[in-house]
Amino acid sequence: MQNTKQKPSTKQKLTIAAIFGAMGPGLLAALSGNDAGGIATYSSAGASYGYKMLWMLPVMTVLLIVTQETAARCGCVTGKGLASLIRERFGVRKSVLAMAALLIANTAVTISEFAGIASGLALFGVPASISVPLVALLVWMLTMSGSFQRIEKILLLVSCVFVTYIVAAFMAGPNWGEVAVDLVVPNIQNDPSYVSLVVATIGTTIAPWMIFLAQNNVVDKNAGEDDIVLQRIDTVSGSIAADVIAGFIIITTGTVLFPAGIQISDAADAARALEPIAGQWSTVLFASGLVAASFLAACVLPGVTSSAICEAFGWERGADRSWDEAPVYRGIITAIIGISAVLVLMPGVDLFQIMMTSQVINGVLLPVVLVFQVVIAADRHIMGANRNGRVWNVLTWATIGVITVLTVVMFVLQAMGYSV
């Protein structure tokens, strides 16, 4: 089952140009991963608990590296996507379970992206009744035509405005001693909202769709076993970049909003955190980045989801396939976009809560995907000499166990009537 393509040796490839070339996709993926739900979750963490949730980020960075590196390595060794490997290793019935989890999680996240678009454009005075249908149509057209790649880098560039959180954090004047302590000393609270936010943070940092996307990207690049080292550089750099930005979002909101007692209930509240650097332009800066990041993810998620499902069950897929050739592939994309847009347009819907809830759903369903991934990655017959080592297996199973326990605690608290 291993990918036997002949490649030049890895040693020949480890030049400065090759290393920087390998880092590019990971860094871009990191920025696109900080989407509407991610910004909402990290902003809420800082606004609600100050720096007290920073300790999670070093842990999440390690776990993100583990899951993304595993995905990339599986792609290099087998030349196949995760969905195909799940079907081959576990059969069709268990593939249905994996794909159902992915479909639910990704649809929830896509809904949050449209909520982010609606929230961002509302700051410019555009009502959701106008913005959501128009953007949904544009997303559908770009996804169906495959022309999304033409504007992908532009959107990534615009979404880079969230890097300004790094500058804003320094300008806000945080207590760096307190930041350093909270970064390394775990702060566990029995507050139900805290537990929910922990699950959401895990779900937005290690999203199920990112695992499928990482492996598919490696397969699409025709990377082989000799590319594993370069792909490892890619994953490590991307994971660190993603969580550095996440950390500064928490520091910024923890410095600006938490002392003032401002709880984030909408995009306008979150935008206030950028006032130290942008002043009266903070709303414009935040809204532009939120819309770009949300639109980017909204274009990626339906395609990733549909491609994985079709791959798992052997159906035709790809933007180059017509409706007659790939009706299921195109139908799933259309359904996800349509359902997401309609739900966001429902009267009285809380857009910010949608963004938060989607990340909780991500966290709850993540163990399902991780179980399949770790079993495949540890299989000698599939991975050969590149199978998971003991440390990687322990970290992955520990992640699965912790998330499962947190999920049970969260649901028990809800059943007991506590507000989560």
Feature annotation, model-predicted:
Residues C160-N187, V195-N216, F372-H381, L406-Y418:
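Hydrophobic alpha-helical segments and their helix-loop junctions in multi-pass secondary transporters
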Residues I65-R73, V77, V218-V219, I240-D269:
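Extracellular/periplasmic helix-exit of transmembrane alpha-helices
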Residues L97-M99, L123-M144, V161-Y165, P327-V342, ...:
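Transmembrane alpha-helical segments of multi-pass small-molecule transport proteins
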Residues Q2-K7, T41-G46, E69-K94, A260-E275, ...:
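Flexible loop linkers connecting adjacent transmembrane helices
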